Amino acid sequence: MLVLVLLAACTDVHGGAVELSWTLRPESGDSSDLFVNCDTGVDGANPVERMRLDWQVGAITGSASWPCTDYHGVTGFEVPSGSALLTVTPECATGDAAPITYTAPTPQERDVSVGNTVNLGAIEVFVEISDCGSGVGSQACICG
């Protein structure tokens, strides 16, 4: 019991936390799969490496990211208290995915309080994986 009390005393709480889970779905519906992996295996599309959560509370901004293949993430208690605008962005090995290659949920506004966790639930990020490449009629694909 004393160990639990000591461990709890070591937790650094400056704000609230945010928890979310994610799945990737094909944008066009051409895929026979309802969901796709972070590495879609499609020529012209490269793996989504990480998922990033950005927040803005007043003039304060911050972010946290997790390996895409975790499909779940929780920030530390670092999100400032107040009305937070929360956005999710897929990240490629070379940086942010091009906005035309994915559709994420619209920014969510949530009230954050010190020591509490806001749960965004399970979100779906739609990724472009059809007609990838540089030929005529092709389009930009996720992380391509």
Which residue stretches match the model-derived regions?
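Sec-dependent signal peptide recognition
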Residues: 1-4
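C-terminal motif of bacterial Sec signal peptides marking the signal peptidase cleavage site
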Residues: 6-9
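Bacterial lipoprotein signal-peptidase II cleavage site
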Residues: 11-17
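Disulfide-rich extracellular modules and peptides
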Residues: 12, 40, 70, 94, ...
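Short amphipathic, basic-aromatic surface patches that mediate peripheral association
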Residues: 21-43
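Short, acidic Ser/Thr/Gly-rich low-complexity loop/linker segments typical of extracellular
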Residues: 56-73
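Structured interaction patches on ligand/partner-binding surfaces of diverse proteins
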Residues: 67-70, 91-133
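Short Pro-Gly-centered beta-turn/loop motif in secreted/extracellular proteins
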Residues: 68-94
